Structures are given as C-alpha cells and as structure tokens.
C-alpha cells in the first residue's frame, strides 16, 4: 500500500500540470473545511469561560455546544475569503471580544462573520470587531439573541448592493440589538419577518438604509443614530412599531420612510438636513430630501418629533390618512408639507397642533396657539409647486391677499392639510441637542 501511494505521488510530481491541480484542490479543501472551535488552544478559567489567546486563526469554525468564548486582545479569526467566520448551532453560546476578518462574500450563501443557526437560542455576540465584504452578523430563525457593542465595517470599494448587511435578523423573536456601530455595509440593521425585537442605541453610518424593516411587527426602535445614509429609517410593511428617540443626520432622500406602516408610534425623533440623492433602489421613487415620507400608512401616532432644514418636512401620499399628527416641530424646511389625497386632514389633537416656523399668524389671547389655522398646502402652495419662481413673493402682500381670498371664499379650496391650532413655540427643544457619545 505504501509503495502504491508513493508511486501515485511520483506520477503526480512528474507532471507539472498535475502538481498545480493537486495543490489547488488541497488549498480549496482546507479553506472550505469547517473546524470545531475546540480545535483551537482554548483555556478555561474559574468561571467556566474559554479564553482564546492572541493569534491568527485561519479558516471557518463551528460551535456546537453551549460555551462562553472570550478572545484575548490580538485574537483574530481570518476566514480567508471563504464561508462564515464562526457558525453557532448550539444554545447559550457567548462570543466576546474577537476580531473577524475576510470572511466569505457570497451573499446568496449568507456568508457572515458570525452566523447564528436556528438552534443558537440565547446567543450573546458582544464587543467584537468585524471587517469584511459579506454580512456581519446573521441571526437565522432563532430566539433571544443579544448583539451588543459590536463594531462592524463593510467594504466601501464594493457597490452598495454587493455588500452584506451589518446585522441581519430573519424570522427572529426576542432579539436585543444594542450599542452596535455599523458603517459602510449595505444596510446597517435589516429586520425581516421578525417580531418582538429591540433595537437601541446603535450608530449607523455611510450605508444604504440605516434601519430597514420588512414584514416585522411589535418591534422597538429606540435612541439610534443614522448619518449619511441613503435612507435613515426605512420602515416597510410592518405594524405596531415603536420608534422613539432616534436621530437622522445628513441622510439622503429620506430621514424616516413609512411604507405600509399601521398602528405604530413615532415620538421624540429628530431629523435634520435631509437632502435629495439617488436611492439605488427601484422600490422607492420620488426622493426629494424628505424628513418624513408616509406612503399608504394609516392609524399611526406621530407626535413630538422635530423635522428641520430638509427639502420637504413631511410628505403624505397614497391614502395615508387617519394618522394622529400633533406637537411636532417643522423648522426651516424648504417646503413644510407635501400632501396628495382627496380629503381634508386635520393635524391637531385636543386643541393642540404643531409648530411651523413659517406660520404668519398671531396669538392675541396669549394661550400659546395661533388664532388662525395653518394650511400648508392650500391653493397658493400648489401655485408655488407649479411655478417655483413665485416663491420669491412668498410673504408679499399679494400672496397674503390670495390666502385671504381663499379663506373668505372656501368654495375655492381643494383638499389638503389643516392645523387648526398651530403652536406659537416649539416644544421639541430638548430633541435638538447633540447626543452624548
């Protein structure tokens, strides 16, 4: 048998082409092989945690039993451009403090730095650094995962659509995604068909969408920050979302986009400096730098938010009616409201409306409310949309005369938005200040 094997090797080595093929096959096999994490030089401490010493660990690894893995400084998983960095298929696994580099970039195969399989219930992925072309963390059909304080960076040399998402939840329940920093990936956090999850305190920069919801219900989006994305918060086909205390700064196209959203709450959010740009997505058209865009969304509460210095403050269309909109501030937007529908919408609740920086009314009884209604998209506004050059006369006596005629002869009015009790002062000053950190 030894002689036969030796003869075979001699035959291979005697042919240069066969040598190359043999080497390539050997390299491919070793790169694709998934190794048990227990093959690494793990050291257990008194708290039953397994420590991975500093060093570069090449290849893909699997965790198939409950354990806590803590990487010492300098411990690096280098997947050599193939597959996942680590695949977890057991419950109650913790991976903390590790660095993941150069995992696979096959998005169809869902290549990820850390891939949590359905059996990985209760996984904790904490304080890791990830840099690569595929997905950062993919959580697949499991419950109660905690993704905390991870730093995830994509590859800016690739087109946005060719990168993986920083964090991807699919069919997940009870996940906590807290304090992560994601940049230069495709979407920062993508939530698909996943209910009852919490996204809190994440920073999401230089992405397509910062937060992207699809078919996900009963989720909380709290105190997150998006910057320089092509849409800060893309909320689509979902219900019962609680979106509070978030910030959108210098995003393109949309700060917050609501598409088929129902029975949800938007409160205490701050959106500023949204400018127009390319969405890179055929699903969404008409991007004009809108702080808030509401498309075919009903029965939502939108209260005590601040929208400023954007091309459009708020745009409603496609049957977006029966929403509670009050106590918001619309400040310094080039166009405060764009509304396309067939019936009048009242934007005040219990005698209190919104603050509009371009409101020209007065408050003779000092009750903090304007004495005349604010109508941001009356016939005069429609005239300004059709002929932008007329905007030079915006506050002229002629324009005010047209508005007076419209109020005096309401038969001329077309359906639009009315705020019957506009606020004379904004109530959202506390939202304007820069966040700590």
Positions of predicted regions on the chain:
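Bacterial N-terminal signal peptides
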Residues: 18-28
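Extracellular beta-strand-rich solenoid/capping regions of secreted or surface-exposed proteins
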Residues: 42, 57-70, 77-97, 101-121, ...
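Detector for repetitive beta-architecture
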Residues: 47-49, 54, 60, 66-68, ...
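Extracellular beta-strand solenoid repeats
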Residues: 51, 62, 70, 78, ...
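Extracellular beta-strand/beta-solenoid scaffold signature
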Residues: 79-87, 107-117, 131-139, 159-170, ...
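Acidic/polar low-complexity surface segments
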Residues: 101-116, 123, 146-171, 176, ...
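Functionally critical loop-and-helix segments that line ligand-binding/catalytic clefts
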Residues: 149, 270-293, 300-304, 308-437
């Amino acid at each position: 048998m030894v002689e036969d094997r030796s003869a075979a090797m001699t035959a291979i080595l005697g042919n240069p082409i066969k040598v190359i093929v043999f080497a390539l096959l050997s390299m491919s096999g070793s790169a694709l092989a998934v190794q048990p994490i227990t093959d690494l030089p793990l050291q257990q401490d008194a708290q039953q945690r397994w420590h991975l010493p500093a060093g570069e660990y090449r290849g893909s690894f699997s965790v198939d039993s409950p354990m806590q893995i803590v990487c010492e400084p300098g411990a690096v998983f280098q997947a050599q451009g193939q597959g996942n960095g680590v695949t977890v298929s057991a419950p109650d696994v913790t991976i903390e403090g590790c660095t993941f580099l150069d995992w696979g970039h096959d998005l169809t195969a869902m290549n990820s730095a850390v891939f949590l399989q359905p059996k990985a219930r209760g996984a904790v992925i904490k304080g890791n650094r990830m840099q690569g072309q595929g997905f950062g963390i993919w959580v697949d059909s499991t419950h109660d995962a905690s993704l905390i304080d991870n730093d995830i960076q994509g590859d800016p040399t690739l087109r946005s659509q060719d990168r993986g998402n920083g964090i991807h939840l699919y069919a997940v329940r009870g996940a906590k995604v807290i304090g992560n920093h994601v940049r230069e990936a495709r979407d920062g956090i993508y939530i698909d068909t996943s209910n009852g999850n919490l996204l809190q305190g994440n920073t999401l920069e230089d992405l397509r969408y910062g937060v992207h919801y699809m078919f996900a219900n009963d989720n909380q989006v709290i105190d997150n920050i998006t910057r320089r994305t092509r849409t800060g918060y893309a909320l689509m086909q979902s219900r019962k979302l609680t979106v509070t205390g978030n910030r959108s700064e210098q995003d393109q196209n949309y700060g917050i986009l609501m598409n088929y959203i129902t029975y949800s709450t938007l409160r205490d959010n701050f959106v500023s400096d949204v400018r127009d740009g390319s969405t890179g997505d055929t699903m969404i058209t008409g991007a004009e730098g809108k702080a808030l865009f509401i498309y075919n969304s009903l029965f939502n509460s939108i209260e005590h938010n601040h929208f400023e210095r954007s091309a459009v403050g708020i745009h409603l269309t496609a049957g977006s009616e029966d929403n509670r909109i009050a106590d918001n501030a619309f400040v310094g937007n080039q166009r405060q409201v764009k509304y396309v529908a067939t019936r009048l919408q009242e934007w005040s609740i219990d005698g209190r409306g919104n603050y509009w920086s371009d409101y020209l009314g007065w408050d003779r009884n000092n009750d903090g409310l304007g004495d005349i209604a604010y109508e941001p998209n009356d016939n005069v506004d429609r005239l300004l949309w059709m002929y932008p050059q007329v905007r030079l006369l915006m506050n002229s006596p002629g324009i005010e005369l047209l508005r007076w005629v419209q109020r005096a002869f309401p038969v001329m009015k077309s359906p639009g938005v009315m705020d019957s009790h506009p606020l004379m002062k904004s109530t959202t000053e506390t939202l304007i200040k820069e966040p700590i950190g």
